Amino acid sequence: MAPPGSSAVFLLALTITASTQALTPTHYLTKHDVERLKASLDRPFTSLESAFYSIVGLNSLGAQVPDVKKACAFIKSNLDPSNVDSLFYAAQSSQVLSGCEISVSNETRDLLLAAVSEDSSVAQIYHAVAALSGFGLPLASHEALGALTARLSKEETVLATVQALHTASHLSQQADLRNIVEEIEDLVARLDELGGVYLQFEEGLELTALFVAATYKLMDHVGTEPSIKEDQVIQLMNTIFSKKNFESLSEAFSVASAAAALSQNRYHVPVVVVPEGSASDTQEQAILRLQVSSVLSQPLAQAAVKLEHAKSVASRATVLQKMPFSLVGDVFELNFKNVKLPSGYYDFSVRVEGDNRYIANTVELRVKISTEVGITNVDLSTVDKDQSIAPKTTRVTYPAKAKGTFIADSHQNFALFFQLVDVNTGAELTPHQTFVRLHNQKTGQEVVFVAEPDNKNVYKFELDTSERKIEFDSASGTYTLYLIIGDATLKNPILWNVADVVIKFPEEEAPSTVLSQNLFTPKQEIQHLFREPEKRPPTVVSNTFTALILSPLLLLFALWIRIGANVSNFTFAPSTVIFHLGHAAMLGLMYVYWTQLNMFQTLKYLAVLGTVTFLAGNRMLAQQAVKRTAH
C-alpha cells in the first residue's frame, strides 16, 4: 500500500505529438535489435563482397570484426586487381580496418580511371570512384561528374540514382554537384506512402535504406539540408526499422548504414522517447522516467527534456506545466510527488531540446495515476413501505460482514448506502464499476444491479420486491449480498461480502419449482421424427418387370438354337478379339457405373475403352471389306 500523500504512476502508451501533430517513430532499433543486427553482420567471410558487407556494416554500428588482422589478410588474398568490383570492396573494407593498407599498382590505377567513363554503367562508375577514394588515389572530379551525369541520363532506375548519390559523395566539394543533389527530390517523389506511417520504394526495404544512407552522406558532404520533410524522415525510419531479422548480408548492411546516417548527420536526428521500466517499477512514487535516445538506442545525454504541460483526459484541465526533467544516469526523471494528482488518466506533453537537429522531439504520453479506494459510511436499512415504522439502520465497517439477516418482502424494502473515497487524498471517488450482487444460497441464482451515486456522490441501492420480482423470477430465499468495486485506476479492486438478505415474494406469484439459473444444465433431449419410407411394390411386379427386360435376350438365344448362329465369318484376328472384348467391357462398365461409379469417373474410363474399341472395330470392318472384295 502506498503511503498517504503518494500515488502510483503507470505508463501506458506513446501517442502522436499533440502540439505539432508530427509523426512519432513507431519502429526503431532497441539495444536488443542492435545486437541482433550485429550478429547478422558478423558472419564468416565467403567472398570479398560478404567481407565488405560485414566489415563496413559493423563499423556503421560502432563495432568491428573480431579479428582485424585476419580480415585484412582475407581481403588481400582475395583481391583481384583486374576487377573494378573487387577493388571497390577491398578499398572500402580496408579503409575502416586500422592498419590495413593495400598497395595499388599503376596498372590498377589506370584500370579504375578508365572505368570512370560514359561507356561504363553507373554501378561501375560508383565502384571505380569509391575505390580510387578508398585507396587515396587522385581523381578528376569534374570529368567523373560529367561521365556520371551522362550515364545517369541513360539509366533512370532508382538503384542507379542512389548509386549516383553515393558516387557524388566521393567527389570534390568544388565540383558542381547540384544536378546530382536535385535527384534527391525526384527520388522522394517516387516513394510510396503506406497508411500515412510508412514510406518506401516499390523495390523494397533494402533500396529504401540505401537511399537514406546515400542522401545524408551526400548532404553532409556538400553542406546542404536535404529536401526531405521531417514527417517523411520518420516514415522512412518506420519502414527501415520495421524488419528485425535479416536473411541476406546486403539487407542487414543497408539497415546498418541507414541507422548510422539517421543517428549521425548534420540535419535530421530523430528522437526516440520511451518510458523506462514497467508499471510495477513506479508503484510507490509519482516519478515519470523516460529514455531519450537515437534510432540506435544511443542515449542523448546532452538533450534537455522538459514537460510542456499535463492535462486531465476527463476534464482537459491543465494540472502541470513547464517542468524540467533531471538526468539520472541515462534516464530522464520528472518527480511530481508533491503535486498530489487525483487518480485518473493524464496526457503529458514532453519536448526534447538541446540540438536543432532533433526531429519528432515532441511527444505525448498517456499516464495513469492509480490509487486505493476506501468504503465509508456503509449503512444497511429496512424501510417500511407505508412508513408507519421508523427505518432500522445498521452501520458496517469494511471488510466485516453485518451480523444477522435483513428482510425484504411485500411490507418493507431493503436499502444499502455507502460512499467511496481516495485513501491517499480523502477525495470522493466514482469508479467505473460499482455493482451489487445477490447470490441465492440454495439455488445458486445470481442477480446483479448497478449502484448509482446521487448528486452528493452517495451510492444507494434499494430493493423493492414488487418491482424486482422479474429479475429474481419471484424466487424467495436467503441471498448473500456482495459489493463489487473496480476501476482501471484502482490498485485494490474490492469484492466484499456485506450481509445476508432474506427476500420473500408473495407465494401466489412464486413458481412451484425454482429452477437454477445455471446456464450449463443439460437441456431436454430432442426426439427427431424421420419420414417413413414409401411402400415398395409387391415382389411379383418386380419379377415380372425383370422378365420383360430379359425377354429379348432369351428370344435371341432361342432363335440362335432354332435357325443357328452364323459365325462363319468370325476370325480370331487381334482386331476382332479386341473389338468384342472392348464392347463387352463397355457393357460391364455400365453395370459398374450403376453400382459404384459416378458420371465423371465413368466418362473417364469410357473414353479409354471407347477409343480402343473404335480403332479395333474400324480395323475389323476394313479386313472384312478386303475379304469380300477378294472373293
UniProtKB/Swiss-Prot annotation:
Cytoplasmic side: 562-571, 618-631
Keywords: Endoplasmic reticulum, Glycoprotein, Isopeptide bond, Membrane, Signal, Transmembrane, Transmembrane helix, Ubl conjugation
Gene Ontology MF: a single term: ribosome binding
GO cellular component, as recorded: autophagosome membrane; oligosaccharyltransferase complex; oligosaccharyltransferase complex A; oligosaccharyltransferase complex B
Pathway(s) annotated for this protein in UniProt: Protein modification; protein glycosylation
Bilayer-crossing regions: 541-561, 572-592, 597-617
Localisation per UniProt entry: Endoplasmic reticulum; Endoplasmic reticulum membrane
Listed GO biological process terms: protein glycosylation; protein N-linked glycosylation; response to xenobiotic stimulus
Keyword Glycoprotein: yes
InterPro entries the record matches: Ribophorin_II_2nd, Ribophorin_II_3rd, Ribophorin_II_C, Ribophorin_II_N, Swp1
Annotated crosslink Glycyl lysine isopeptide (Lys-Gly) (interchain with G-Cter in ubiquitin) location: 154
Record's bilayer topology term: Multi-pass membrane protein
Lumenal side: 23-540, 593-596
Major subcellular site: endoplasmic reticulum
Glycosylation sites: 106
Signal peptide annotation: 1-22
Function: Subunit of the oligosaccharyl transferase (OST) complex that catalyzes the initial transfer of a defined glycan (Glc(3)Man(9)GlcNAc(2) in eukaryotes) from the lipid carrier dolichol-pyrophosphate to an asparagine residue within an Asn-X-Ser/Thr consensus motif in nascent polypeptide chains, the first step in protein N-glycosylation. N-glycosylation occurs cotranslationally and the complex associates with the Sec61 complex at the channel-forming translocon complex that mediates protein translocation across the endoplasmic reticulum (ER). All subunits are required for a maximal enzyme activity.
Quaternary structure annotation from Swiss-Prot or TrEMBL: Component of the oligosaccharyltransferase (OST) complex. OST exists in two different complex forms which contain common core subunits RPN1, RPN2, OST48, OST4, DAD1 and TMEM258, either STT3A or STT3B as catalytic subunits, and form-specific accessory subunits. STT3A complex assembly occurs through the formation of 3 subcomplexes. Subcomplex 1 contains RPN1 and TMEM258, subcomplex 2 contains the STT3A-specific subunits STT3A, DC2/OSTC, and KCP2 as well as the core subunit OST4, and subcomplex 3 contains RPN2, DAD1, and OST48.
Protein family according to the UniProt entry: Belongs to the SWP1 family.
Protein's name according to its UniProt entry: Dolichyl-diphosphooligosaccharide--protein glycosyltransferase subunit 2
Native source species: Rattus norvegicus (Rat)
Gene name as annotated: Rpn2
